[in-house]
């Protein structure tokens, strides 16, 4: 073997050449004229040994602002949360790490049970009846929810709050274009969905209304008031929710939500650039046969022992591709497992305590900003994010903070012209009092 990763011997080459009727490599390429063949050595560096390569890659990676050396106040959909050490241990086990869709239940009970437990925990958090095995991420889960609503109601108009994550709204627009659906944005007022505008837009042509809870600005939407407006015209009520926040907030299911979706990233999934993430999708029983993605159910075998299987598979593309509820094939099962392990390790009280710490530390940060003379833009209740008026370009502020080993908040001016110079600050349970005080003092010094 000439190369550790290319297990081809000289005997292998000889056998392959003989099979196609040539004796040498030169004879194989004889139809290429000598005049156009490359001669000499390529102008690239010589190969490195594994230790040399690891050293060089580590040096390159060290240029990044990483969460081991920087205090992060950046959220906007991806958060720096505590992940129990056991998470990586469990998801690294080969029976989980390399598993694919468990079509054969007799040899996939471990994987199926893990998915079933994920579904169960999502239902408990959201207050819904049924949850699927996961989606790609929160954005695609939101778009799939809108597609379900349009198909169920046979209506073409989708109302979405402008306080929903901008990237999720962009994914929705992409899905809607292919299905010839109309997406109408409902403006926000004082950091939450403008209910007067919503009331004026909801009519018998609306398939669904989509809001986020807490919303993109961190504010807690008034779901009870929104639900009354939405269901007046028998439209579906879709709520995108941070699952960790539901350890403290009343779950959307208690407010009459028809579909609850979101991203399980806060539970055991690191803040890696670009993902992967783990979307979740939960509904009432009324939509059980229309929910996209895999569903795992509990049953008993011929001996009466508990077992787990993929259920209601007639909805899926490997059974009826042309009539499938969705053509999502593989899901984020490994990340769903990570979320399940994290939630299990934390336990109910741990999830509640984690949510409580997010609230209390974010409230402390808000008070410190106000004491320093900053304006916190919205006055409503929030979870772990709030908006600060920087009075200058947020990029300038963040560039200065990076010099102090601080990753600043999200620049809202990128998505909302009316919020130029405003920073969305995220404060999770991992931030210390000292880190919060340093952030406020450094921003005060460059105000």
Curated annotation (Swiss-Prot):
Q: Which GO terms describe its biological process?
A: glycine decarboxylation via glycine cleavage system; nucleoside metabolic process
As recorded in UniProt, its EC number(s) are 1.4.4.2
**Pfam families reported in the protein's UniProt record:** GDC-P
GO: which molecular function terms? glycine dehydrogenase (decarboxylating) activity
Which top class of enzyme applies to this chain? oxidoreductase
Cite the InterPro entries for this sequence.
GcvPA (IPR023010), GDC-P_N (IPR049315), GDC_P (IPR020581), PyrdxlP-dep_Trfase (IPR015424), PyrdxlP-dep_Trfase_major (IPR015421), PyrdxlP-dep_Trfase_small (IPR015422)
Catalytic reaction equation(s) = N(6)-[(R)-lipoyl]-L-lysyl-[glycine-cleavage complex H protein] + glycine + H(+) = N(6)-[(R)-S(8)-aminomethyldihydrolipoyl]-L-lysyl-[glycine-cleavage complex H protein] + CO2
Which keywords describe this protein according to UniProt? Oxidoreductase
Give the protein's biological function. The glycine cleavage system catalyzes the degradation of glycine. The P protein binds the alpha-amino group of glycine through its pyridoxal phosphate cofactor; CO(2) is released and the remaining methylamine moiety is then transferred to the lipoamide cofactor of the H protein.
Which proteins does it associate with, and in what oligomeric form?
The glycine cleavage system is composed of four proteins: P, T, L and H. In this organism, the P 'protein' is a heterodimer of two subunits.
Q: Which PANTHER family does UniProt cross-reference here?
A: GLYCINE CLEAVAGE SYSTEM P-PROTEIN, GLYCINE DEHYDROGENASE (DECARBOXYLATING)
Concerning its family, UniProt says: Belongs to the GcvP family. N-terminal subunit subfamily.
List the NCBIfam families.
PRK00451.1
Protein name per Swiss-Prot or TrEMBL: Probable glycine dehydrogenase (decarboxylating) subunit 1
Source taxonomy lineage?
Bacteria, Bacillati, Bacillota, Bacilli, Bacillales
């Amino acid at each position: 073997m000439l190369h550790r990763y290319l297990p081809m011997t000289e005997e292998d080459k000889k056998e392959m050449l003989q099979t196609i009727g040539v004796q040498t490599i030169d004879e194989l390429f004889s139809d290429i004229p000598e005049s156009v063949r490359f001669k000499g050595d390529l102008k690239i560096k010589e190969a490195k040994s594994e230790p040399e390569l690891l050293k060089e890659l580590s040096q390159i990676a060290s240029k990044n602002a990483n969460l081991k050396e920087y205090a992060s106040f950046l959220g906007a959909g991806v958060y720096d949360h505590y992940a129990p050490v056991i998470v990586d241990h469990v998801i690294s086990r080969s029976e989980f790490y390399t598993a694919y869709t468990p079509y054969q239940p007799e040899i996939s009970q471990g994987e199926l049970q893990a998915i079933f437990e994920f579904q169960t925990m999502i239902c408990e958090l959201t207050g819904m009846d049924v949850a699927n095995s996961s989606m790609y991420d929160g954005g695609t889960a939101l778009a799939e929810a809108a597609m379900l609503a349009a198909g169920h109601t046979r209506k073409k108009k989708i109302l979405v709050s402008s306080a929903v994550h901008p990237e999720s709204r962009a994914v929705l627009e992409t899905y809607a274009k292919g299905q010839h659906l109309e997406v109408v944005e409902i403006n926000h007022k004082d950091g939450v969905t403008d209910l007067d505008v919503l009331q004026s837009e909801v009519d018998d042509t609306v398939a669904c209304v989509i809001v986020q809870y807490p919303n993109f600005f961190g504010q807690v939407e008034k779901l009870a008031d929104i639900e009354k407006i939405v269901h007046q015209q028998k439209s579906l009520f879709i709520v995108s929710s941070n699952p960790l926040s539901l350890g403290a907030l009343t779950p959307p299911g208690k407010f009459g939500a028809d579909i609850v979706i979101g991203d399980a990233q806060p539970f055991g999934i690191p803040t890696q650039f670009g993902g992967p993430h783990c979307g979740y999708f939960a509904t009432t029983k009324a939509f059980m046969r229309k929910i996209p993605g895999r569903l795992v159910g509990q049953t008993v075998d011929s001996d009466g022992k508990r077992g787990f299987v993929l259920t209601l598979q007639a909805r899926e593309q490997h059974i009826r591709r042309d009539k499938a509820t969705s053509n999502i094939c593989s899901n984020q099962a490994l990340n769903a497992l990570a979320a399940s392990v994290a939630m299990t390790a934390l336990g109910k009280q741990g999830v509640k305590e984690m949510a409580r710490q997010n609230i209390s530390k974010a409230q402390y940060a808000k008070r410190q900003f106000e004491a320093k003379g900053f304006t916190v833009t919205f006055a409503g209740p929030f979870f772990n994010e709030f908006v600060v008026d920087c009075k200058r370009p947020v990029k300038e502020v963040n560039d200065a903070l990076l010099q102090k080993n601080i990753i600043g908040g999200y620049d809202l001016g990128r998505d909302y012209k009316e919020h130029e110079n405003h920073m969305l600050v995220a404060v999770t349970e991992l931030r210390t009092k000292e880190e919060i005080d340093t952030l406020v003092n450094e921003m005060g010094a460059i105000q």
